[in-house]
């Protein structure tokens, strides 16, 4: 059009999704003396009369000509919902009450396996030869499962509903267990379907309308009708102790079988999540519509933790794998003791069993009992031999004895399951004051996930948001903000400041419930401020930080909580000490150093800590800088409930309640620090349509694929045969042919030599045994579950505790060179400090109010805000419980040290010492060995020290050729014991170590720093 009109100047403006796209027209030989401009909007063409320049408000996104006024509400809305980048930075955290429906039917299949070592192509692989299981829970489901077990010829034990199977054939145990679980799954889902069909006769009309042969063939898409009847909720738990890291892996190739004969009417949801060599989730749900489902409008029940049948969109049968180890974090014997369960004495010589299956025999003593070498000690050998003689069962049958102990473990685990369920339900009802919640501890797989759910429930009850999320009280950082917040999470300190043998007395002080105390302190809450309000709040921070002479109060009401990008410079080295207030990863390793900090991400608490320790802190401009509108003690009630329950349990001698309160108190911090990634592992047949579309669009890619080793499946081996284009069959030889002389065979150029091998047909589909690792092509992580910034502030509060501790020890040394100061501490762990006699004296004097035995608070009081933490002397006398010290100690490296003994300061009793050797077999080490190791290294001796231990390599999904998915292999791990070589501190005199500083910088730090040279200014 413009070409036809030929104006002096012409252009077309197209309005698309809030943007104007200009297309300039090139006009040759113009006729009209004036310009013409068109606007295309919503498929309509407008003639532009005139242009007027406008401006866009960077805070609210509005356009204006001359002047403009925007409100805080509009700025917040634009920042959190409109701006294409910041609108994805913070997500609301979804909420569901911790309770479950009262009508839920639960069935538990508790099992354990025993294995022997099989030498295969992937190394020493552990193969199950025995499996025992016990049935408990809903009587109808127990009876059904018992009938299935008997039909499949599982052998019954003397205890009711207890069955076992023994076979050394590789793969047979797993196949039998798979068949059992599969048949239970099939029959229980049939129960749900029959009930659904009986209460919905309209399904017969759907069958006729869609010309379906049988009502069982109706698909989920067909029965989208308004259903009737009472929903059923059935949960089936496959449970064992420490099975997710072992038993479920060696059986998984058999039991993870997804292509089943499940009726097409069911909607199937699967949740399979391997993590850190363990199967964290292996759940599958078979769902049908819930006729009572209603979208909730009144959330009063949710505040009480109550979940009703109307809250579930589907009625279901759920199959879940749960591990009692993930809920107790200790061995089965210790867990039984903690929850006051009876445990039979004795143990099994598993190495003898292993030899029996491997070579057919094992060493025996003169009575036919397994030799002493199979037992941990002579005492264990004598005890078990005495128990065997008491039973008077004749000759020692190693398989029968193994079966007996396996059955006992299963029965103890089953009793533990019942105890955990009842105890946690009572704890939530009485201690958390949620009697209507009907809490089920096995609904979530780990103690961390349960603690997080309880925390959210308590917070939801307090804030009452009246919606299905926590509103803006607590948000989750996502996308770019997730990575930014994760940069502010700094691990705990762990390093010695003295290497060698220390002949001075050493006391060990430990912070009491460090994370629990930190969690009671205030944390940032509310929707982060928009850039305009953020700049105003940051100005107040800058003003306070510029005054280096004035310390800042941690609870200054003028300063809002936030996360900043900072530079910081330390004071003169004479005013530094061995406990730096902050750490950095700039050199590739986490170092607690007194070096200048550049471009570090830190919480507002860290800014105050650095400032109060004499550091000059500068806030750097960063669009990701986050400032929150208020402080709030979001976790105080949760921690206070657990501390109160623990103290009450101590008074009442209730070991069960004490164990629960202690576990829940310690587990919450870890849930906030959960690290997410962009990967997920699925079986090939689990790729739903939505996942396939994301792969097709390029949003996800298949990072790797691997197959479960086929040896684990049952198979039929066919004789040799040719599949395609076989060579022509040879004609029968006649007599004349037999007498002919054989001539030299010269092959043709095109000749191929065929070697025919047996073909094995597996009883499985390829999709069932193929694992895909899917990875999001975007590096940004979507998070709507965890308030990760809470973990940052928890760790920041713990650094405040240690910073105050440093003041007790080192304040009097300010102004002295570091190498001339008296040694006051020699080792620092995350929540403990090893101090000398001088350090102990200062703790008793300057830090007296922080020692637990002198009284003090563990829970922060918002009405009288002050830093709240306590310590106690961990080295105590075994007899009188007074403070004790180690007369001699040796420190080799982080988490590698030994205290020779503990000498009581009151009664003089000499007790046993303490040894820590992470990654080593501690049974092979003692104080003298570590001391010899140090002396040999210091004197450049030739003696070398090693420890060896058996290690289990767990493989779930891999693209490595030397490892098969779903296998556990046994390897011998040998490690060298030696003093610290790659130190992250400066060696002063061969013994003392000091943090890096300006005069002794970190040699690993190769970051480039741009600066202007003075002569170029």
UniProtKB/Swiss-Prot annotation:
Function description: Eukaryotic-type DNA polymerase involved in viral genomic replication. DNA synthesis is protein primed, and acts in a strand displacement replication. Assembles in complex with viral pTP, DBP, host NFIA and host POU2F1/OCT1 on viral origin of replication. The polymerase covalently transfers dCMP onto pTP, thereby initiating complementary strand synthesis.
Highest rank taxon of the organism: Viruses
Family assignment from sequence similarity: Belongs to the DNA polymerase type-B family.
Organism: Bovine adenovirus 2
Main location: host cell
Additional notes on this entry: This DNA polymerase requires a protein as a primer.
Reaction catalysed by this enzyme: DNA(n) + a 2'-deoxyribonucleoside 5'-triphosphate = DNA(n+1) + diphosphate
Database matches in SMART domains: POLBc
Name of protein: DNA polymerase
PROSITE patterns in UniProt: DNA_POLYMERASE_B (PS00116)
Oligomer and partners: Heterodimer with the terminal protein; this heterodimer binds to bp 9 to 18 of the genome. Forms a complex with viral pTP, DBP and hosts NFIA and POU2F1/OCT1 for initiation of replication.
Record's subcellular location: Host nucleus
UniProt keyword annotations, A-Z: DNA replication, DNA-binding, DNA-directed DNA polymerase, Host nucleus, Nucleotidyltransferase, Transferase, Viral DNA replication
GO molecular function: 3'-5' exonuclease activity; DNA binding; DNA-directed DNA polymerase activity; nucleotide binding
GO cellular component terms given for this protein: host cell nucleus
BP terms from Gene Ontology: DNA-templated DNA replication; viral DNA genome replication
């Amino acid at each position: 059009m413009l070409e036809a009109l030929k104006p002096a100047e012409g252009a077309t403006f197209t309005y698309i999704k809030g943007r104007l796209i200009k297309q300039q027209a090139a006009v040759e030989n113009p006729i009209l003396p004036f310009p013409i401009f068109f606007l295309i909007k919503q498929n309509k063409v407008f003639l532009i009369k005139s242009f007027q320049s406008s401006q866009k408000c960077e805070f609210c996104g509005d356009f204006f000509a001359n002047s403009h006024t925007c409100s805080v509400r509009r700025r917040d809305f634009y920042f959190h919902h409109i701006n294409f980048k910041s609108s994805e930075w913070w997500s609301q955290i979804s909420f569901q009450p911790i309770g479950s429906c009262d009508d839920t039917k639960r069935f538990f299949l508790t099992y354990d396996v025993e294995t022997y070592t099989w030498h295969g192509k992937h190394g020493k692989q552990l193969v199950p030869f025995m499996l025992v299981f016990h049935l408990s829970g809903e009587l109808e489901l127990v009876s059904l499962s018992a009938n299935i077990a008997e039909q499949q010829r599982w052998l019954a034990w003397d205890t009711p509903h207890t069955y076992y199977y023994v076979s050394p054939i590789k793969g047979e145990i797993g196949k039998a267990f798979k068949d059992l679980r599969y048949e239970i799954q099939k029959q229980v889902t049939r129960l749900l379907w029959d009930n659904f069909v009986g209460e919905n006769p309209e399904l017969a009309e759907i069958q006729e309308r869609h010309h379906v042969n049988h009502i069982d063939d109706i698909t989920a898409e067909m029965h989208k009708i308004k259903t009737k009847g009472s929903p059923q909720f059935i949960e089936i738990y496959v449970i064992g102790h420490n099975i997710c890291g072992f038993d479920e892996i060696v059986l998984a190739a058999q039991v993870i079988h997804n292509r089943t004969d499940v009726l097409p009417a069911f909607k199937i949801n699967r949740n399979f999540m391997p993590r850190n060599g363990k199967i964290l989730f292996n759940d599958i749900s078979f769902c049908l519509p819930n006729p009572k489902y209603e979208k909730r409008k009144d959330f009063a029940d949710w505040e009480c933790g109550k979940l009703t049948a109307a809250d579930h969109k589907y009625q279901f049968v759920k199959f879940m794998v749960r591990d009692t180890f993930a809920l107790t974090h200790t061995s089965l014997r210790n867990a039984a003791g903690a929850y006051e369960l009876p445990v039979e004495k004795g143990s099994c010589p598993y190495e003898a069993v292993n030899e029996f299956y491997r070579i057919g025999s094992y060493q025996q003593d003169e009575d036919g009992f397994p030799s002493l070498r199979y037992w941990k000690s002579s005492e264990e050998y004598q005890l078990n031999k005495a128990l065997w003689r008491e039973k008077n069962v004749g000759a020692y049958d190693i398989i029968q004895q193994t079966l007996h102990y396996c059955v006992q473990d299963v029965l103890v685990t089953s009793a533990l399951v019942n105890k955990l369920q009842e105890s946690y339900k009572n704890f939530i009802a009485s201690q958390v004051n949620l009697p209507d919640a009907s809490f089920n501890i096995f609904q979530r797989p780990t103690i961390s996930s349960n603690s997080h759910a309880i925390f959210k429930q308590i917070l939801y009850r307090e804030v009452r948001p009246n919606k299905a999320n926590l509103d803006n009280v607590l948000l989750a950082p996502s996308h770019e903000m997730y990575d930014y917040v994760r940069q502010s999470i700094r691990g705990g300190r762990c390093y010695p400041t003295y290497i060698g043998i220390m002949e001075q007395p050493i006391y060990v002080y430990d912070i009491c419930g460090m994370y629990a105390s930190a969690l009671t302190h205030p944390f940032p809450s509310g929707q982060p401020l928009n850039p305009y309000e953020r700049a105003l709040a940051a100005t107040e921070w800058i003003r306070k930080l510029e005054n280096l002479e004035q310390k800042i109060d941690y609870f200054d009401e003028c300063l809002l909580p936030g996360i900043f990008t900072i530079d910081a410079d330390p004071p003169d080295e004479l005013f530094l000490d061995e406990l730096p207030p902050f750490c950095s990863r700039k050199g590739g390793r986490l170092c607690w150093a007194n070096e200048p900090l550049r471009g570090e991400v830190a919480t507002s608490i860290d800014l105050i800590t650095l400032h109060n320790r004499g550091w000059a802190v500068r806030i750097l401009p960063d669009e990701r800088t986050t400032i929150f509108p208020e402080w709030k003690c979001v976790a105080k009630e949760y921690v206070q409930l657990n501390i109160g329950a623990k103290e009450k349990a101590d008074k009442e001698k209730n070991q069960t309640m004490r164990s629960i309160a202690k576990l829940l108190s310690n587990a919450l911090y870890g849930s906030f620090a959960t690290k997410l990634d962009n990967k997920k592992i699925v079986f090939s047949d689990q790729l739903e349509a939505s996942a396939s579309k994301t792969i097709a669009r390029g949003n996800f890619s298949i990072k790797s694929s691997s197959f479960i080793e086929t040896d684990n499946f049952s198979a039929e081996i066919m004789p040799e045969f040719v599949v395609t284009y076989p060579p022509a069959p040879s004609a029968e030889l006649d007599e004349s042919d037999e007498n002919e002389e054989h001539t030299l065979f010269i092959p043709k150029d095109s000749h191929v030599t065929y070697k025919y091998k047996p073909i094995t047909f597996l009883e499985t589909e390829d999709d069932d045994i193929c694992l895909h690792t899917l990875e999001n092509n975007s590096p940004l992580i979507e998070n709507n579950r965890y308030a990760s910034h809470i973990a940052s502030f928890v760790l920041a509060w713990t650094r405040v505790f240690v910073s105050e501790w440093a003041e007790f020890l080192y304040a009097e040394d300010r102004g002295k060179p570091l190498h001339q100061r008296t040694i006051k501490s020699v080792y620092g762990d995350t929540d403990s400090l090893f101090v000398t006699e001088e350090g102990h004296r200062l703790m008793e004097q300057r830090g007296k109010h922080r020692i637990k035995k002198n009284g003090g608070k563990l829970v922060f009081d918002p009405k009288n805000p002050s830093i709240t933490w306590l310590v106690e002397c961990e080295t105590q006398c075994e007899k009188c419980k007074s403070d004790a010290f180690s007369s001699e100690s040796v420190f080799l490296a982080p988490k590698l040290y030994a205290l020779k003994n503990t000498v009581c300061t009151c009664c003089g009793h000499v007790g046993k010492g303490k040894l820590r050797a992470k990654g080593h077999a501690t049974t092979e080490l003692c104080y003298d060995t570590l001391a010899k190791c140090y002396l040999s290294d210091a004197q450049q001796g030739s003696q070398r020290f090693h420890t060896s231990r058996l290690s289990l390599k767990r493989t779930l999904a891999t693209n490595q050729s030397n490892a098969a998915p779903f296998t556990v292999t046994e390897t011998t791990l040998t490690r060298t014991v030696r003093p610290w070589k790659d130190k992250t501190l400066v060696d002063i005199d061969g013994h003392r170590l000091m943090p890096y500083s300006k005069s002794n910088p970190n040699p690993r730090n190769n970051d480039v720093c741009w600066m202007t040279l003075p002569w170029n200014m």
